[in-house]
């Protein structure tokens, strides 16, 4: 059955990944030793999307874990589900990338990449019908961004027809972990535009805001943030893993969400998000879920969908509910907020319904939207990039690893082109007789 191979790289990717596997194990009733302890046959029905069955009925995650330093891996291995992973699938170096994209992409990472690819091949051969890859990484550091994008391009070469989905943590607007984030992120986006099929854009600040505002946590930890991310990750693939009335998979998601190949950066959201104390005061209904799901405060990246327009969106509901009600709510959203949807793609919201809700909830929903307002993220990173690059600040760290300034210039212009493309489709209307020949003719006359 349609397997997904999960790859996590760098500190951020490994921490998100660890949380994700906790969630998936919980949903499928797999305990930390890989033994199935669940009660429902539906948990086992398509457990092989994410798990491989080993001898003795053990379920082993189809996961490849990579990093350029051993630290995060060690703590993951001694964590709550460390024993479930296949020991050979931990691939790590000793030196670390030191937040340097060039080290991850060209020097340290390039030395380690072949052993990672061997593990990926071995896992891919274990699949009946591999659907695609999902990669967790951050774009601000060195390993997740540099080596992560290197791995994505290598996998793209070897498996050109498989879906490539990434969960990418972008640098936050106000909270910066590393000074050279804008460089690393811009160089990574340059790669992701060309080599990934779908990118779910996340950032820590938006996740902090959700924890503060909605979940009422006074000092949220990275564990809390990662839990939000893993709820979304599980929602995106729930239709593959559990029976449902309206199914979606990675490819259907891409076909329905990507009107133009380069515009594949999505905002994600999850509902219901309620603080522990106020849970019993809320009824979980489809209208309630829909309302929270489309709420701008619920988006897991620091871009405000009200500043742009939705090209397309997808809503995945989980739990027992009437599909008629789901469809009514979706039409309702589009009618009430028609100015926030581009009018030249009619009916641009896809919905799917999966019967099995997440553990502990009666129903839930995951939102994935392709909104032109995502350009805010790129624009912000690009401004910071330009400010530093104009003075050539910190550039020697990259050039000493063999990089060329040309590459920076290319990445910068690719990012700016992306912003311009989003802007162009935000302003486009259905009446525009958009004809490229006219533009060319006008340019010739001028």
Curated annotation (Swiss-Prot):
Residue sites binding GTP per the record: 11, 69, 138, 142-144, 204, 226
BP-aspect Gene Ontology terms: microtubule cytoskeleton organization; mitotic cell cycle
Signal peptide as annotated in the record: none
Cellular compartments annotated: Cytoplasm, Cytoskeleton
Disordered: annotated span: 426-446
Gene Ontology annotations for the cellular component aspect, listed alphabetically: cytoplasm; microtubule
Residues given in the record as Mg(2+) binding sites: 69
InterPro entries assigned: Beta-tubulin_BS, Beta_tubulin, Tub_FtsZ_C, Tubulin, Tubulin/FtsZ-like_C, Tubulin/FtsZ_2-layer-sand-dom, Tubulin/FtsZ_GTPase_sf, Tubulin_C
Family matches, as Gene3D superfamilies: Helix hairpin bin, Tubulin/FtsZ, C-terminal domain, Tubulin/FtsZ, GTPase domain
Tissue note: Expressed in anthers.
PROSITE patterns, sorted: TUBULIN, TUBULIN_B_AUTOREG
Domain of life where this protein originates: Eukaryota
Molecular function GO labels: GTP binding; GTPase activity; metal ion binding; structural constituent of cytoskeleton
Inducers of expression: Down-regulated by abscisic acid (ABA).
Acidic residues biased stretches: 429-446
Pfam families the record matches: Tubulin, Tubulin_C
Cofactors: Mg(2+)
Keywords: Cytoplasm, Cytoskeleton, GTP-binding, Magnesium, Metal-binding, Microtubule, Nucleotide-binding
Function noted in UniProt: Tubulin is the major constituent of microtubules, a cylinder consisting of laterally associated linear protofilaments composed of alpha- and beta-tubulin heterodimers. Microtubules grow by the addition of GTP-tubulin dimers to the microtubule end, where a stabilizing cap forms. Below the cap, tubulin dimers are in GDP-bound state, owing to GTPase activity of alpha-tubulin.
Family listed: Belongs to the tubulin family.
Subunit: Dimer of alpha and beta chains. A typical microtubule is a hollow water-filled tube with an outer diameter of 25 nm and an inner diameter of 15 nM. Alpha-beta heterodimers associate head-to-tail to form protofilaments running lengthwise along the microtubule wall with the beta-tubulin subunit facing the microtubule plus end conferring a structural polarity. Microtubules usually have 13 protofilaments but different protofilament numbers can be found in some organisms and specialized cells.
Protein name: Tubulin beta-8 chain
Organism of origin: Oryza sativa subsp. japonica
Origin organism lineage: Eukaryota, Viridiplantae, Streptophyta, Embryophyta, Tracheophyta
